[in-house]
Amino acid sequence: MNHQNLLSITRNLVHPPISSGLVLLSARELDKMRRVGQLAANLLNHLESMVQPGVSTQALNDEATRWMEDHGAISATLGYAPPGYPPFTGAICTSINEVVCHGIPNPKQILKDGDIINIDVTLRLAGYHGDTSRTFLVGSVSATARKLVEATQESMMRGIAEIKPGARIGDIGAAIQAYAEASGFSVVRDMVGHGIGRQMHTELQIPHYGKRGSGLKLRPGMVFTVEPMLNEGTYELTFLADGWTVITKDKKLSAQFEHTVVVTEEGVEILTLA
């Protein structure tokens, strides 16, 4: 689940609340993060087979709930209610086509041929969180939709490739932005990656745009998400009346991919690889 950029003026409320201070995780804590991260990745693998025309987003949500229970985990998003926001009613986020993020599962929302859908899962297991998302193609999609989805995944991986001790947070965003814009797409500014561990969101913010050499210097033990959202058109957003759903201002397509990563002595480890 995304973190709203504190520098954004889109809304007055900070979304969501965060713990204070930079968090560096120990080797023991990282073992727990690996376990929950792998579980989150496995959940997306499981749900992928259900992504087809005629399936409701509520059905995806219900299956995710059952699967988490079977594996001893719980959803970190279900009932999540930052100050000023209604409780989130989904165990997962399901964001279709122009929905950028935080789409709420609904029995009346049925997948159609040609859709793209991002499924974002945040699990809690043994007190730690695993957060990952992928955008899936539903049936036969347009060339533009396919290009957008592929560019979004590649931009995420290019950002992750920048991560190592001594690198700057801005290096991640600069790599993502350069690839996205060269591919003809825009990068969402108002939603950013975030620190994660015992809390779903910590103080650390990871913008998916920016300048090389800027921002906080990366250190071993830092754990955070890299989760770019690329839009077919403008990067500007609109927040719907439900208090959660975010869509593109021009109603054009949006895609997102997300991994949870840790800075290691040698570089980076992806904790949510399938």
Curated annotation (Swiss-Prot):
InterPro entries with a match to the protein in the record: Creatinase/aminopeptidase-like, Pept_M24, Pept_M24_MAP, Pept_M24A_MAP1
Organism: Synechocystis sp. (strain ATCC 27184 / PCC 6803 / Kazusa)
A molecular function (GO) term: metalloaminopeptidase activity
Family the entry assigns: Belongs to the peptidase M24A family. Methionine aminopeptidase type 1 subfamily.
Enzyme kind, highest EC tier: hydrolase
Function: Removes the N-terminal methionine from nascent proteins. The N-terminal methionine is often cleaved when the second residue in the primary sequence is small and uncharged (Met-Ala-, Cys, Gly, Pro, Ser, Thr, or Val). Requires deformylation of the N(alpha)-formylated initiator methionine before it can be hydrolyzed.
Binding-site list for a divalent metal cation 1: D120, D131, E258
Keywords, alphabetical: Aminopeptidase, Hydrolase, Metal-binding, Protease
UniProt-recorded name of the protein: Methionine aminopeptidase B
Cofactor note as given: Binds 2 divalent metal cations per subunit. Has a high-affinity and a low affinity metal-binding site. The true nature of the physiological cofactor is under debate. The enzyme is active with cobalt, zinc, manganese or divalent iron ions. Most likely, methionine aminopeptidases function as mononuclear Fe(2+)-metalloproteases under physiological conditions, and the catalytically relevant metal-binding site has been assigned to the histidine-containing high-affinity site.
Top-rank lineage group of the source organism: Bacteria
Annotated catalysed reactions: Release of N-terminal amino acids, preferentially methionine, from peptides and arylamides
Entry GO terms, CC: cytosol
Lineage: Bacteria, Bacillati, Cyanobacteriota, Cyanophyceae, Synechococcales
EC number: 3.4.11.18
HAMAP family: MetAP_1
Binding site for substrate: H102, H201
Cofactors required: Co(2+); Zn(2+); Mn(2+); Fe(2+)
SUPFAM superfamilies tied to this protein: Creatinase/aminopeptidase
Gene Ontology BP terms: proteolysis
Pfam families to which the protein is assigned, alphabetical: Peptidase_M24
Assembly notes: Monomer.
Metal-binding found in the keyword field: yes
Positions bound to a divalent metal cation 2: D131, H194, E227, E258
